[in-house]
Structures are given as structure tokens and as C-alpha cells.
């Protein structure tokens, strides 16, 4: 694959002013960021953070439009049908993209959308009811192997990134746990605190108050490396399941065929916004760190990540809603 520098070097000189004009002319009217989920979730919050900074940078209104339904497909279809001029964008998540990708076929994000940048790739924590009694991941696996099907874990819904992270854990550990899907993380956390389920793979901020109150124990973090946002908490891989890593992601997309100069402009402005101290602080409150990525690298990242979760869905016989 030729490098980006080589591609630019081979671009006809007559085309360069056209690319520059496309970038300079953007935006020419208000921009809409579609969120394919209801208001209030992490995707919505991140979209509004970007919208605020884009509006300041572009000196035009940037509107966040929530189009929930169909596991994210309704909002995505709206973006796919939009004019390819950069004035309609989308912030979505791992679970939303899985709804578009399906499970049986090879997936390339560029066949459906134009990837712009990764926004954040937050890890989860293995949140456990204290009554389970495990002190680390290795002990949890030992307990689960001794009692196949006894342990239950909750999630915010079938096919959610937290659900798939737990299924990957069970598969790699060689254990069987019962999945209990909920309509959102709040009800799942309530049952975890009450002891009606044993585990959750949850966003850290979701369980923070329960952990502080001793009602829930954070056993490990699911990322490949420990995060400074959770000081002292070791990873699943370090504490009993080598090779395990699972993170969700939030990212920015546009319709197919948006001119590359406009995509580069948006990606650059997004990276600038994400690296501001105030943005980093707001993301930290969500348990995430900014992860801006160039469009080509991000497209490869999404395709590889979706392929990973497709394998989990097939191997675990999960029927996506």
C-alpha cells in the first residue's frame, strides 16, 4: 500500500488547487452531527463536545441530532443518504457499527461511510459483587470453572460492546456464564449491587460510586495496558487471562465520497479539539482518553475491530437484535 506521502506526491498539480478550494469552502452552512442513539449516553455526550468546538472553529452552527432506533441503523441510514459534502457527520460506537456490519460477511467501513477519526477507545472494568469472593481474575476463573453456568453477568443489551467483552472473556477463559441483558447499564448496576447478578463489564464511571461505597469491587480493567484514569487497577491480562484485551470506541464518520480535503480538515479540527485540556478533562469524567487517529489508519482500525467482534458473535452463537 503506498504511503500517504507517496500518494500526495503523485497527485497532479492541477488537482491541488481544487482540493484546496474544497477545503477552504467548507463549511458553507450549518453542520449536523447525527447520533444514532437516544440523548444522554456516552455517544451523545462526545458528539456535543465535538459540536461545541466545531462551531467555534467554523463560526457556524453545529447541530446534534439524535436518531435512535434499529440498534443504530436508522441514524446510520440517514447519514449514508446525505449529500457527500461534509455537512452531515455522525458520531457512533462499536455497538452501532456492529449493527451495520452484521456477522457473516467481510466488512469494510469504506463501503458504507467515510471514516474521519477515532474519538476515544474507553476500557471497561470487570465489576464484581463482593459476595463472589474472588481477589483477582485468576481466582474468578477458577471459581467459574468449578461451577459451570452458575455465574451471571449483566450488560446494557445484546450485542453491546460490554456484552461482547464479557463473552470474549468467557471464551478465552474456557468458562460458561449466563448473560442477563438489560435496557441500559443503570438497571444492570442495580441488580449487581443487590447481588442478583455476579458481574458486569462496565464503563468505570458507571460503577464508580458503588465501588467507592464498597457495594461493588473493580477486579481489573479490560484494556491492553493499565490506564492512568484508574490508578492501581491492573489489567485482565496481567491478573489471570494473558492476551485478553477489549475496549469500546466512539468515532466520527461522514457519508461516502466526501472530498478528501474536507475529511482532512474535519479530522484536523477534531484532533485539535480532542487535545484541548478542557476536552481531556471532560473525557476523563467519562472514563476515556482522547485517541485521535488519521482517516486511513482509523479505517483499518475499525475493520480489524469489527472482524474481531464478528468472530466472537459467531463463536458464542449470539443473535444480534
Question: Which ranges hold each PLM region?
Answer:
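C-terminal lobe and pocket-closing loops
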Residues: 121, 207-275, 307
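An extracytoplasmic/periplasmic, membrane-proximal ligand-sensing/linker region
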Residues: 28-30, 172-175, 260-321
Amino acid at each position: 500500500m503506498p504511503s500517504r506521502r507517496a500518494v500526495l506526491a503523485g497527485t497532479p498539480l492541477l488537482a491541488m488547487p481544487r482540493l484546496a478550494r474544497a477545503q477552504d469552502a467548507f463549511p458553507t452552512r450549518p453542520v449536523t452531527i447525527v447520533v444514532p442513539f437516544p440523548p444522554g449516553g456516552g455517544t451523545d455526550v462526545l458528539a456535543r463536545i465535538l459540536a461545541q468546538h466545531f462551531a467555534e472553529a467554523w463560526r457556524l452552527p453545529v447541530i446534534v441530532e439524535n436518531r435512535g432506533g434499529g440498534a443504530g441503523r436508522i441514524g446510520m441510514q440517514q447519514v449514508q443518504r446525505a449529500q457527500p459534502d461534509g455537512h452531515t457527520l455522525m458520531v457512533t460506537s462499536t455497538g452501532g457499527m456492529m449493527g451495520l456490519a452484521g456477522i457473516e460477511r467481510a466488512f469494510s467501513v469504506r463501503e458504507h461511510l467515510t471514516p474521519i477519526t477515532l474519538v476515544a477507545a474507553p476500557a471497561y472494568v470487570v465489576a464484581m459483587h463482593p459476595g463472589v469472593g474472588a481477589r483477582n481474575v485468576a481466582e474468578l476463573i477458577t471459581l467459574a470453572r468449578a461451577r459451570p453456568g452458575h455465574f451471571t453477568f449483566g450488560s446494557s443489551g445484546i450485542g453491546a460492546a460490554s456484552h461482547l467483552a464479557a463473552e470474549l472473556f468467557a471464551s478465552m477463559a474456557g468458562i460458561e456464564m449466563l448473560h442477563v441483558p438489560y435496557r441500559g447499564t443503570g438497571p444492570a448496576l442495580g441488580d449487581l449491587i443487590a447481588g442478583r447478578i455476579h458481574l458486569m463489564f462496565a464503563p468505570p464511571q458507571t460503577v464508580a460510586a458503588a465501588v467507592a461505597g464498597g457495594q461493588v469491587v473493580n477486579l481489573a480493567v479490560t484494556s491492553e495496558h493499565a490506564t492512568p484514569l484508574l490508578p492501581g487497577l491492573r489489567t485482565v491480562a496481567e491478573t489471570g487471562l494473558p492476551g485478553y484485551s477489549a475496549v469500546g470506541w466512539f468515532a466520527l464518520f461522514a457519508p461516502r465520497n466526501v472530498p478528501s480535503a474536507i475529511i482532512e480538515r474535519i479530522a484536523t479540527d477534531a484532533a485539535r479539539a480532542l487535545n484541548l485540556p478542557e476536552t481531556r478533562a471532560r473525557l476523563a469524567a467519562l472514563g476515556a482518553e482522547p485517541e485521535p487517529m488519521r482517516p486511513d489508519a482509523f479505517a483499518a482500525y475499525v475493520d480489524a475491530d469489527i472482524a474481531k467482534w464478528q468472530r466472537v458473535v459467531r463463536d458464542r452463537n449470539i443473535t444480534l437484535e
